[in-house]
């Protein structure tokens, strides 16, 4: 009621009839009610429909008042007999659904050509690298799907390792992590993921300590600006240390980039002035965000001035469903105790789980977990310990 221009109006004068729903688990009426959208649907009819689902006890979910919806002559076949005004249980012959795939070349607009090239991954190609080798050149020449194996030692890099294809970078020996250190003349990332990039990185140490006469690394792992394609990132068993500039982060997603999934597990973040994990670059508050599905588990955060985890999805636009955030089995020690700081800043995740985490002397100047959730968001925080 009294909606602002271009906002929501009440649902009225809608007819839904002669539809067949087979194994549909979410038939809902009144979805989306909040303090702005207060009027339930009116003059709506749901007539002569068929609902078949052996896994449900009732045909629909009433999220709000359904008095304005007329149910009539609907047939249902559910897990058990169901009787309600407008619904009868009958044995209904399910429609025969096609089980063959559509022929793609015969579908879609005739003028459309898919211009996105997806390089075939060569999962068998390995590249053994020793200290003194130019990592950027090895990555540039590696085939898609290649595995770059680093021997123990220090690898100074002068510019970002540019990942624009599926690649894996791992240590030859997990117990002796290779150390990557930036010594370029201009600030740059250590690793930059670009269009086409899908990266797995395992058991590598990223050291952001300042080399005399050289520039600082802007990030351990980050993204190119204004990417068109989504990417995936898996970071396992890595260490990020000695990033001494407040605006430079260990792992970061930049504005206008989007990760389908980010997995960070078994990692150590220590002695950082900036954030450890930052996916908070979309500040326009129009429903955009940097990563859709994020898993952070079994990680340790020690002596951080910045935020250990900073994820942001602003605005009230419901056309996007994410992000989905899971944080579990993580430890935070002496992290972000500055005034109004927070250990986790989690703004706008649609589904959030934080469980089995320990917070020791962290977030004392502000909040341990800072949320700004909407009524429809699913938030679970369980089995966490806090000591100060």
Per-segment meaning from a language model:
Residues 1, 12-23, 42-53, 68-78, ...:
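Right-handed parallel beta-helix
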Residues 1-2, 24-31, 55-62, 79-86, ...:
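Short glycine/acidic-rich loop motifs that flank beta-strands on beta-rich extracellular proteins
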Residues 15, 45, 149, 156, ...:
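Extracellular beta-strand solenoid repeats
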Residues 77-126:
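Surface beta-loop-beta hairpin patches that serve as ligand-binding interfaces in beta-rich domains
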Residues 117-157, 162:
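Acidic Gly/Asp/Thr-rich repetitive segments characteristic of extracellular carbohydrate-active
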Residues 131, 165-223, 237, 242-244:
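Right-handed parallel beta-helix/beta-spiral solenoid domain characteristic of secreted/periplasmic
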Residues 153-154, 173-176, 388:
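Acidic glycine-/aspartate-rich tracts in secreted/extracellular proteins
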């Amino acid at each position: 009621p009294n909606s602002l221009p271009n906002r929501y109006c009440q649902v009225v004068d809608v007819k839904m009839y002669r539809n067949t729903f087979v194994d549909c688990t979410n038939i809902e009426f009144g979805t989306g009610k909040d303090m702005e959208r207060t009027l339930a649907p009116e003059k709506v009819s749901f007539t002569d429909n068929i609902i078949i689902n052996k896994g449900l006890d009732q045909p629909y979910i009433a999220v709000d008042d359904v008095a304005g919806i007329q149910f009539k002559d609907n047939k249902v076949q559910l897990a058990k007999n169901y009787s309600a005004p407008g619904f009868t249980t009958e044995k209904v012959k399910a429609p025969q659904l096609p089980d063959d795939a559509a022929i793609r070349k015969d579908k879609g607009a005739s003028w459309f050509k898919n211009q996105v090239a997806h390089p075939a991954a060569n999962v068998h190609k390995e590249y053994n690298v020793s200290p003194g080798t130019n990592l950027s050149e090895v990555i540039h020449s590696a085939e898609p799907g290649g595995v770059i194996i680093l021997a123990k030692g220090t690898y100074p890099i002068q510019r970002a390792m540019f990942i624009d294809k599926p690649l894996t970078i791992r240590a030859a020996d997990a117990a002796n992590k290779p150390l990557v250190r930036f010594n370029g003349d201009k600030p740059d990332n250590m690793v930059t993921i670009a269009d086409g990039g899908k990266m797995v990185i395992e058991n590598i140490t990223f050291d952001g300590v300042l080399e005399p006469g050289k520039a600082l690394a802007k990030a351990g792992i980050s993204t190119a600006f204004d990417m068109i394609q989504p990417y995936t990132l898996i970071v396992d068993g890595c260490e990020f240390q000695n990033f001494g500039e407040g605006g430079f982060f260990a792992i970061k997603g930049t504005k206008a980039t989007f990760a389908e999934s980010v997995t960070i597990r078994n990692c150590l973040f220590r002695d950082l002035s900036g954030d450890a994990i930052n996916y908070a670059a979309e500040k326009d508050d129009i429903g955009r965000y940097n990563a859709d599905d994020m898993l952070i588990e079994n990680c340790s955060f020690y002596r951080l001035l910045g935020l250990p985890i900073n994820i942001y999805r602003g605005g009230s636009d419901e056309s996007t469903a994410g992000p989905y955030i899971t944080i579990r089995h993580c430890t935070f020690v002496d992290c972000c105790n500055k005034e109004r700081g927070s250990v986790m800043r989690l703004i706008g995740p649609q589904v959030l789980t934080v469980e089995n985490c320990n917070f020791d002397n962290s977030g004392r100047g502000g909040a341990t977990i800072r949320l700004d959730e909407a009524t429809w968001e699913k938030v679970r925080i369980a089995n966490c310990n806090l000591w100060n």
